[in-house]
């Protein structure tokens, strides 16, 4: 990703990163609606308009959305909601590995883990699946505060999943992985 961004900058493009809703929110009361297409799309279109307003004539009125993973999904959403940047000309989207088809990802990952004989790889896959699921649940709790992690995860995993409201992907994944290793060794 850094190489791609560097290439865009070298070619003279302005690169703007969205400020996704709920990330870094100081009170901790507003959760990030992880993988909520409209929220992500609005973050991108708002960022594009703000950058153009700030830079004025130093920036073109043409824009493209490019993203990877969650950003890939956000870029697809920006295409859907491009009209929000009404005074600018939307030129297209490049979505790299957008988050999509969760059923396939989760069932495929579980099948892969089930066939894996190497414990490290098995736990790596399962911890990753649990991490994404927990982040999705955290995002769903923003509009649905009565949704409980125990409705999705069994105890004690539900307690780890609650950390999705404050931890980033890597830290949360390590917590799931550590618990899985402890369970495997018991």
Where are these regions (language model features)?
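Short amphipathic alpha-helix adjacent to the substrate-entry channel of hydrolases
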Residues: 1-15
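Stable alpha-helical elements in mature extracytoplasmic
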Residues: 4, 40, 44-47, 71-78
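Short beta-to-alpha linker loops that shape the active-site pocket of alpha/beta-hydrolase fold enzymes
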Residues: 14, 19-23
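Glycine-rich "HGGG/HGxG" loop immediately N-terminal to the catalytic nucleophile
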Residues: 22-33, 49, 74
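Alpha-helix capping and helix-loop boundary segments enriched in small/acidic/polar residues
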Residues: 31-39, 65-70
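Alpha/beta-hydrolase active-site loop
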Residues: 33-55
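Primarily recognizes the serine-hydrolase "nucleophile elbow" in alpha/beta-hydrolase
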Residues: 50-121
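Accessory cap/linker subdomain of secreted extracellular hydrolases
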Residues: 99-186
